[in-house]
Amino acid sequence: TIANFELFYRQSKSSCYYAEVFFPAIAETRREKIFRPRVEQLIKLCEEKAINVKRLFDVGAGFGIFLEEWRKCFPQAQLLAIEPSAPLARECRSKSLEVVEETVENVVGRDNSADLVTCFEVLEHVYDPLAFLQVLRRLVRPGGYVLVSTLCIDGFDLQVLWDKSNQISPPHHINFLPVEGFKKLFQRAGLINVEVTTPGRLDVDIVRNACKSDPELLQGQRFLNNLLEDDSSATALQNFLVEQRKSSHAWVIGQKK
C-alpha cells in the first residue's frame, strides 16, 4: 500500500542510511558532476520551449542541491522543496528553501500553482506511477510543465546486464518503462506535448565496470567486448545511445492543458 511505501521511505534502515550517511559523503561531488549540469540542461530545455519559470516545485528534493543551484541562476524564482524524509527536509531548510515535509500525494493547498514541477529519479520508486503523475499534474498551472527523470528499460546497460544490473533493485527501484511507455503514461495522466529524451552518459561505463568485476559477463560477445575496450568506440557508442533514445537515463516532459 501507499502507507507502507511512505513508512519505508521515512523509517527503513536503507533510507536512513542514504539520507544520513551515504548522500552527505558524496553531496558536493554530485553538485559538480550532476546537479550543475542538470540545471544547465534544464535551462536550455526551458529556453527551447519558452517556459518562463517563476515558480518551481521539486518533488523528492533530497538535499536541495538542485534547487540551490537553480536559485543561483534565478534568484527571484519562487522555489518549493517537497521532501518526505525528515533528515533531507532539514537539509533543505538549512539552505533557506521553503519545504513541505510530505509525500507529494499528501501536499495540500498547492494545486494549479507551479510553472514547472521537476521530479528527478523518483518515478522508479513509487507505488503507482500513474496516480503519482496525476498528482504532479495537479500542482502545475494550466499551460505549465511536468519534467521527470527516471530509468528507462530500453537503455543499453539495463538491456545488456538485465538481472545483473545494480539498478534493478527492489524494493527501491520497481518501475522500468520503455520510451513509448513513458509517452502513454504521461498522456494517460492528462499531459500533452509529451517528449522523451535519453541524455544519459553512463551506460557504456556501467557495462564496462560490470565487466571488470565479472570478466565472464559478456562471454562469447566478441564484437561488443571489442567495442567496449576501445575508448573512442565506447564514446561513439554512448553518443549513439543518446541520439537514438537508447540510454537508460530518461527525461520526460509534458504540458498541462
What are these regions (language model features)?
Residues 1-120, 130-133, 198-199, 211, ...:
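Conserved N-terminal segment of class I S-adenosyl-L-methionine
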Residues 111, 125-128, 178:
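Acidic/polar helix N-cap motif
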Residues 130-145:
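A short glycine-rich, Lys/Arg-flanked "PGG" loop and its adjoining helix->strand segment in the class I
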Residues 77, 97, 144-145, 191-192:
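A structural micro-motif
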Residues 120-127, 149, 172:
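Short catalytic micro-motifs in class I SAM-dependent methyltransferases
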Residues 147-175, 180-185, 209-213:
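Short, glycine-/aromatic-enriched active-site segment of Class I SAM-dependent methyltransferases
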Residues 191-202:
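Conserved S-adenosyl-L-methionine
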Residues 154-156, 200-203:
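Feature marks short, surface-exposed loop/turn motifs that line or immediately flank catalytic pockets
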